[in-house]
């Protein structure tokens, strides 16, 4: 599957890499895998595999203008689902926002609830 990254995601990633709260996402392995949460999610996207319930991936609603911007960035013409997952389990605060379509995955944002839903 194709994976794309938004400009805003790249800015978010630079910011959170310096936050100790995110060390476990990029440097510690999961209890059910030798991979870190970040590696596990990216490998799942690349292979088209479903994510385990641990990540609590669920659809969220985006505005029509935001969906339009995603369509322009990805060239996608079919239905786009915007998803939210929790790297650190259902009650965690380390989130990834991404869109899922027939073409693949487009990573939109990464951060905490307060970073992403102001």
Feature locations, PLM:
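Basic, Lys/Arg-enriched alpha-helical interface segments
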Residues: 1-92, 100-108, 113-118
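Hydrophobic/aromatic beta-strand elements that line small-molecule binding cavities or substrate pockets
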Residues: 96
């Amino acid at each position: 599957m194709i994976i794309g990254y938004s400009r805003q995601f790249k800015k978010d990633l630079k910011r959170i890499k310096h936050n100790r709260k995110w060390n476990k996402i990029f440097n510690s392995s999961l209890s059910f895998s030798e991979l870190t949460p970040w590696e596990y999610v990216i490998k799942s996207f690349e292979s088209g595999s479903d994510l385990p319930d641990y990540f609590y991936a669920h659809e969220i609603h985006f505005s029509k203008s935001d969906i339009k911007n995603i369509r322009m960035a990805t060239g996608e013409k079919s239905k786009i689902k915007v998803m939210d997952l929790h790297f650190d389990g259902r009650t965690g605060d380390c989130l990834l926002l991404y869109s899922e379509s027939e073409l693949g995955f487009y990573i939109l944002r990464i951060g905490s609830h307060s970073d992403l839903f102001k």
